Amino acid sequence: MIIESRIEKGKPVVGMETTVFVHGLPRKEAIELFRRAKEISREKGFQLAVIGILKGKIVAGMSEEELEAMMREGADKVGTREIPIVVAEGKNAATTVSATIFLSRRIGIEVVVTGGTGGVHPGRVDVSQDLTEMSSSRAILVSSGIKSILDVEATFEMLETLEIPLIGFRTDEFPLFFSRKSGRRVPRVENVEEVLKIYETMKEIELEKTLMVLNPVPEEYEVPHDEIERLLEKIELEVEGKEVTPFLLKKLVEMTNGRTLKANLALLEENVKLAGEIAVKLKRS
């Protein structure tokens, strides 16, 4: 198989993207997060398969050394569409949510974790492949909603149009990455068992969609969305395409004196914990 899977058979596993490490965080914090996520996986009894493309080789279960090499050498940011191109050209590539879900499903991983998903950008025709991949691949994705920089109304409507199931984990509101509230209601679940009951129903009715499990940022790290919106209005966009999200996230870190970075790290850690719990109980079911 073209994918080098380092997953130990029979153990629960969670797939994780590489874009969050390579393009979403400063190098020091990225490595610290990788180590913490690995520590959580050992404590909770699951495998964390960080997925990336190294010199054209798709790897599920990257090591810290490989991740550092990717950050040092540079890596394209790829969605599902670009996978065959970077593989054929022997490039390094960091996977987004869409590419991670696609590759995870090819090797039997059903649970994927991220911080925030892509969506519809404001003011231009720019729709993330995350949405289209979630509309056609059955998986469980644990996230803290969509990234706060997006057009919330348009993205929420697109999620409905694409028939992507949403459930709030101990919340009634759709979270917005750094922010716990959006004013948009979602069905609420209180425990992992309820998540799995919904997912098993999806299997029974053959619904080939990704179940979005929405886990809000811890309250003490929240940056209110109205504050994020005010800051975004002040930013002059200097890039386009796949560079927009990393550019804006970096600017927000600077403008909030690191508060959004702390929020990002906190929500990622909590999402890894929840995804691991789901994977462990899914394996037992």
UniProtKB/Swiss-Prot annotation:
What does the record note about the cofactor?
Binds 1 Mn(2+) ion per subunit.
Q: Which reaction does it catalyse?
A: D-ribose 5-phosphate + uracil = psi-UMP + H2O
The UniProt annotation places Mn(2+) binding at D126
Molecular function (GO) terms for this protein are: hydrolase activity, acting on glycosyl bonds; metal ion binding; pseudouridylate synthase activity
Q: What biological processes does GO assign it?
A: nucleobase catabolic process
Q: Where is the active site?
A: E17, K147
Quaternary context: Homotrimer.
Q: State what protein this is by name.
A: Pseudouridine-5'-phosphate glycosidase
Organism this protein belongs to: Thermotoga sp. (strain RQ2)
Gene that encodes it: psuG
